[in-house]
Design a protein with these regions (language model features):
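Non-ligating segments of multi-cofactor redox enzymes
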Residues: 1-512
């Protein structure tokens, strides 16, 4: 057994209001640069939809994640070494810019400089890639916001598998939920296995997956290999980039920017201890629907004296173990089993988990359209199909989703009877396997959600690091493996790049 620590995240979808504050703050901090205009390390999707980039969940098309072989081993779905080498100059599984969207800005200056005329001047869109005027904006990162497109397009959502999707196109049966997405910082990252240059690595001290900008050569196989499509190619620098989980903040014991600025208090950060020796065994599980339960077995009890002794022997600092004992992620994923992984069938063992959302139930239950099991509504009859949530979070296994939803409903029923009627309804807790202490703690974490409960992040022990971070302090900032310039003048073979036109200057001088 080899114990390692991982900073994990849980998002409570039952409280997400779809405000995009997380997306905007992340964008302003990390990707508001030339070459990354189209990239959103964090984005919020309205499900059901095909997402950003288009149909990212369709691995038959994009070849992301891992696939299990007949002999029980796993390989990246993109192919082995020979297939990657054969396609290294022309990757057939690479999303194009149209699959994301062509980033644009508007000619606001024209509103000030336009001559007098009969009609009011308008700010027309221009591409931030070519600088040319765009006649029509065709797509965007949240184009399907709040079910904004026709159902014929949204029914391509892969989570509709084994569901009669057409009936949910009717107004009376429609449903919606928000899904914030970011890099999963997987225990078994397919992007790292797909990179020909070996530029992607997973940090031992906190599990954050990063791209070494010195080693990256822009082959872009990692983009295809990542099933969540959370790696982006910077066309300015010629390098791939991804969510860095705000590791400078994590090292200082602070939450990520998206978690810090979340309006709905839906994000939780905490430490998980796991057995690194079992990753290959668990990722190779034969039945996809068993992957969720198998991944739970990897996580170790931070209060177990044997685990603590082994963790200290493996170099895990005592402060990290102390944080793991107070981790909200461990409580929600392992203790209470409320949080579930996003698409575990990709076999990457993701570490950003989600609490499934409850559907609007009060009026439906009162009208008799939702059945009741005692004081708890029947979760099989809720507005969001149970099968849809299972396809999204547990590879189609409905039992863990049903258990999580029942426990959320039981907590509400118990607290309602306690606050309104002044009685403790213990029967509703026994039916879902919870104790009074667990429910009171769930209420504190989910409903009250104090800052100190949501974020338990230990400061990094940089004295144990291989590199001297102090020597690079205040040096280059967020550069790209080419000194402090931010972009390289040479291509991957060392030859001088062709001159690039400055898009911002071009926008100012080009005429129609």
């Amino acid at each position: 057994m080899k114990i390692r620590s991982q900073i994990g995240m849980v998002l409570n979808l039952d409280k997400c209001i779809g405000c995009h504050t997380c997306s905007i703050t992340c964008k302003n901090v990390w990707t508001s640069r030339e070459g990354m205009e189209y990239a959103w390390f964090n984005n919020v999707e309205s499900k059901p939809d095909i997402g950003y980039p288009k149909e990212w969940e369709n691995q038959d098309k994009w070849k992301g994640g891992w696939v299990r072989n007949a002999n029980g081993s796993i390989n990246p779905r993109i192919g082995g070494k020979f297939r990657v080498l054969a396609n290294i100059f022309a990757n057939p599984d690479l999303p194009s810019l149209d699959d994301y969207y062509e980033p644009f800005d508007f000619d606001y200056q024209h509103l000030h400089t336009a001559p007098l005329g009969e009609h009011q001047p308008t700010a027309r869109p221009r591409s931030l890639v070519s600088g040319k005027r765009m006649q029509k904006i065709e797509w965007g990162p949240n184009w399907e916001e709040i079910l904004g497109t026709e159902f014929a397009k949204r029914r391509k959502d892969k989570n509709f598998d084994q569901i009669q999707a057409d009936i949910y196109g009717e107004y009376e049966n429609t449903f919606m939920m928000y899904l914030p997405r970011l890099c999963e910082h997987c225990l078994n990252p397919a992007c790292a296995a797909s990179c020909p240059s070996g530029a992607i690595y997973k940090r031992e001290e906190d599990g954050i997956v990063l791209i070494d900008q010195e080693k990256c050569r822009g082959w872009r196989m990692c983009i295809s290999g990542c099933p969540y499509k959370k790696i982006y190619f910077n066309w300015k620098s010629g390098k791939s980039e991804k969510c860095i989980f705000c590791y400078p903040r994590i090292e200082a014991g602070m939450p990520t920017v998206c978690a810090e600025t979340c309006v709905g208090r839906i994000r939780y950060l905490g430490v998980l201890l796991y057995d690194a020796d079992r990753i290959s065994e668990v990722a190779s599980t034969a039945n996809e629907q068993d992957l969720y339960e198998k991944q739970l077995e990897i996580f170790l009890d931070p209060n177990d004296p044997a685990v603590i002794r082994q963790a200290l022997a493996d170099g895990v600092p005592q402060s990290v173990i102390d944080s793991a004992q107070r981790s909200p992620v461990y409580k929600m994923a392992v203790d209470w089993k409320l949080a579930l992984p996003l698409h575990p069938e990709y076999r990457t063992l993701p570490m950003v988990w989600y609490v499934p959302p409850l559907s609007p139930i009060q009026n439906a239950a009162a009208a008799g359209t939702v059945g009741m099991n005692g004081v708890i509504p029947d979760v099989d009859s809720l507005r969001i199909p149970l099968r849809y949530l299972a396809n999204l979070l547990t590879a189609g296994d409905e039992k863990p989703v049903k258990r999580a939803l029942k426990r959320l409903l039981a907590m509400r029923a118990y607290k309602r009877s306690q606050q309104v009627d002044g009685v403790q309804d213990l029967q509703v807790l026994e039916d879902v396997g919870l104790s009074v202490e667990q429910v009171e703690e769930m209420y504190r974490y989910l409903a009250i959600a104090n800052y100190e409960d949501r974020f338990v992040v230990p400061s990094a022990h940089r004295e144990d690091a291989m590199s001297d971070a102090f020597a690079e302090r205040s040096g280059c900032g967020f550069s790209f493996g080419s000194g402090c310039s931010g972009s390289s003048d040479t291509n991957m073979f060392g030859a001088k790049k062709a001159n690039r036109r400055d898009v911002l200057k071009t926008v100012q001088i080009w005429e129609d």
